Amino acid sequence: MTQSLADMRRDYTRDGLAEAQAPGEPFALFHQWFADAVKTEQPPVEANAMTLATVDGDGRPHCRVLLLKGLDDRGFTFFTNYDSAKGQQLQANPYAAMTFFWPALERQVRIEGRVEKVTPQESDDYYQVRPLGSRLGAWASPQSRVIASREALEGLVKATEARFSDTQPHCPEHWGGYRLLPERIEFWQGRASRLHDRLNYRWVDGQWARERLAP
């Protein structure tokens, strides 16, 4: 390593986040920030990439990067194999946290809340707009399970291709969406000298309460 980890840092120099810039509820601000990220972030950064954290039945945390695939006034939607490790963890503990980080904008958004499955129709609607290879992969891959080799996985894909050679694959019952229903959303804007701006929204008694947190 050519540089000490202790010496690795960058200073943040973009504009701050004042209460006057923030609406009373968080979804409008998220939409604004997300639109900024789509316009500003460049590959390899994906604006809709997020880290999803879950906790299993033994209280052990797990995290991974996923893509946000839906957003409305109910919450934030992602899709996966329901039999996967994350699916089993959400079955045992239906709460999760997700984090978006947009480095070019020096912004981060943290979201916490309860998670529920979307309707089968919502899952099928998204499944049908996926590329064919991804739709076949949802059938072929026993996600999170141990497999013998890459060749074994490719064999499963070929078998799935043969199965659906004369028909379009439909959405499997073990695959679909989850929606995180936010109870807390924090907007973080990097500032100089690590004195960052943090505006936190909490869902309290049926409405959003906004507060500033110390950096």
From Swiss-Prot:
One Gene Ontology MF term: FMN binding
UniProt GO BP: pyridoxine biosynthetic process
Cofactor note: Binds 1 FMN per subunit.
UniProt pathway annotation: Cofactor metabolism; pyridoxal 5'-phosphate salvage; pyridoxal 5'-phosphate from pyridoxamine 5'-phosphate: step 1/1; Cofactor metabolism; pyridoxal 5'-phosphate salvage; pyridoxal 5'-phosphate from pyridoxine 5'-phosphate: step 1/1
Keyword Cytoplasm: no
4Fe-4S listed as a keyword: no
E.C. number(s) listed in UniProt: 1.4.3.5
Catalytic activity: pyridoxamine 5'-phosphate + O2 + H2O = pyridoxal 5'-phosphate + H2O2 + NH4(+); pyridoxine 5'-phosphate + O2 = pyridoxal 5'-phosphate + H2O2
Cofactor entry: FMN
Binding-site residues, substrate: 9-12, 69, 126, 130, 134, 194-196
Keywords: Flavoprotein, FMN, Oxidoreductase, Pyridoxine biosynthesis
Positions of FMN binding: 64-69, 79-80, 86, 108, 143-144, 188, 198
Subunit structure: Homodimer.
Task performed by this protein: Catalyzes the oxidation of either pyridoxine 5'-phosphate (PNP) or pyridoxamine 5'-phosphate (PMP) into pyridoxal 5'-phosphate (PLP).
NCBIfam families documented for this protein: pdxH, PRK05679.1
Entry similarity comment: Belongs to the pyridoxamine 5'-phosphate oxidase family.
UniProt name for this protein: Pyridoxine/pyridoxamine 5'-phosphate oxidase
Origin species: Pseudomonas putida (strain W619)
